[in-house]
């Protein structure tokens, strides 16, 4: 017999597929779909940079930091051939009203701006009571599967849902949003665009992007022009709106969620991203090695060593998410400081497995989400 959760439901009852008729009632606008088709690789490559900003209160007190990076990567799923894509990583951490909190987003985005896989981790560390939420989105065949794990104190809740990818044209995930906003800012869009999105509870809804025009902002000691975009996720419960302003090349200058007491601001002017001419590949001359022993043996040893190092470096370049995952894990490890590190690591990385079978008792999570995502 399957274990029941606090509401008397078995795990199987929490794994549900969205009804096609409900999902098909929502769609992205034709203008939004045309925009996605118009984005080329050359334009995307101009958005490969890192933003580093500070989170400040209304009174100007620095509360934490926020960073977003986009870099080239490779993605492979279910033994298929590797696909070139972009790795988007966003992380925010800080202390608001004396409460440590943070959000991490890791996503693989295709050249067509489709989400191949995404992991979102949010936490709030209250005194004697911690809240933790992990959400995974991954493509499995013709389905987009969403796995959510919510931990509140000692209580754990899991749920899984899926959507047919044929009904998700124009879907923009949180990771894809961070890349698309840079493109919209570079183009200085003139008209609103409507896409599909998921809200904080994993519900399918629409999201809109509307231009706010240009205004002046002080960054460091300079007064610069920035272009604003307002993004709204039209959740079935309560819509959420963010206002973001960008430099001419897509660097994020400021970001605020309407109703939030904190603002994310850029404190120093970055180097603007412009098209560059390709530099010729460097030619490295092999330096002669003076061996005192068997030359052939040492030569074979060094050749093999170089081959292994090159192979390892190539793998890390193709999979920059390795460093991202380890960095996020170390940050969370130092925050929690568990006694059993091995068990903690096993539990931390378990949700990243798309093949894991949920086997924990279910508890209710139908109350309002305590998380406040500041990474949109």
Curated annotation (Swiss-Prot):
Record key words, sorted: Cell membrane, Cilium biogenesis/degradation, Cytoplasm, Cytoskeleton, Membrane, Nucleus
Gene3D superfamilies named among the record's database cross-references: cAMP-dependent protein kinase regulatory subunit, dimerization-anchoring domain
S-S bridge residues: none
Coiled coil: none
Localisation per UniProt entry: Nucleus; Cytoplasm; Cell membrane; Cytoplasm, Cytoskeleton
UniProt keyword Membrane, yes or no: yes
Highest taxon above the source species: Eukaryota
SUPFAM superfamilies the UniProt entry points to: Dimerization-anchoring domain of cAMP-dependent PK regulatory subunit
Gene Ontology cellular-component annotations: actin cytoskeleton; cytoplasm; nucleus; plasma membrane
InterPro entries, sorted: CATIP_N, DD_CATIP
GO BP term, example: actin filament polymerization
Pfam family, one: CATIP_N
Annotated region described as Disordered, given as residue ranges: 355-376
Family as reported in the entry's similarity comment: Belongs to the CATIP family.
Role noted for this protein: Plays a role in primary ciliogenesis by modulating actin polymerization.
Protein's name according to its UniProt entry: Ciliogenesis-associated TTC17-interacting protein
Native source species: Xenopus laevis
Lineage, uppermost ranks: Eukaryota, Metazoa, Chordata, Craniata, Vertebrata
């Amino acid at each position: 017999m399957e274990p029941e959760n606090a509401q008397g439901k078995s795990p199987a009852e929490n794994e549900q597929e969205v009804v096609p008729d409900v999902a098909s009632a929502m769609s992205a606008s034709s203008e939004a779909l045309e925009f996605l088709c118009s984005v080329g690789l050359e334009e995307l490559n101009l958005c490969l940079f890192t933003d580093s900003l500070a989170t400040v209160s209304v009174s100007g007190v620095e509360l934490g930091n926020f960073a977003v990076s986009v870099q080239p990567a490779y993605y492979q799923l279910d033994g298929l051939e590797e696909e070139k894509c972009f790795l988007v990583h966003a992380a925010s951490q800080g202390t608001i009203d004396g409460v440590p909190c943070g959000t991490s987003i890791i996503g693989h985005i295709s050249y067509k701006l489709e989400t191949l896989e995404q992991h979102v981790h949010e936490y709030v560390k209250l005194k004697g009571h911690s809240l933790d939420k992990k959400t995974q989105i991954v493509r499995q065949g013709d389905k987009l599967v969403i796995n959510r794990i919510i931990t509140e104190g000692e209580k754990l809740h899991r749920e899984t849902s899926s959507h047919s990818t044929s009904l998700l044209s124009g879907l923009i995930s949180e990771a894809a949003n961070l890349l698309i906003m840079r493109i919209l800012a570079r183009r200085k869009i003139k008209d609103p665009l409507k896409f599909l999105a998921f809200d904080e509870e994993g519900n399918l809804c629409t999201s809109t992007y509307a231009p706010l025009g240009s205004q002046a902002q002080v960054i460091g000691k300079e007064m610069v022009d920035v272009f604003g975009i307002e993004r709204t996720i039209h959740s079935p419960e309560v819509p959420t709106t963010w206002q973001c302003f960008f430099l001419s090349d897509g660097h994020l200058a400021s970001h605020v969620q309407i109703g939030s007491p904190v603002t994310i601001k850029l404190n120093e002017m970055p180097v603007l991203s412009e098209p560059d001419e390709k530099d010729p590949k460097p030619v490295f001359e092999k330096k002669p090695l003076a061996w005192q022993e068997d030359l052939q043996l040492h030569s074979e040893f060094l050749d093999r060593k170089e081959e292994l190092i090159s192979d390892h470096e190539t793998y890390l370049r193709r999979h920059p998410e390795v460093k991202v995952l380890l960095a996020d894990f170390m940050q969370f490890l130092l925050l929690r400081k568990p006694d059993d590190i091995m068990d903690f690591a096993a539990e931390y990385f378990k949700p990243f497995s798309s093949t894991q079978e949920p086997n924990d008792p279910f508890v209710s999570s139908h109350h309002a989400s305590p998380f406040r995502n500041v990474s949109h």
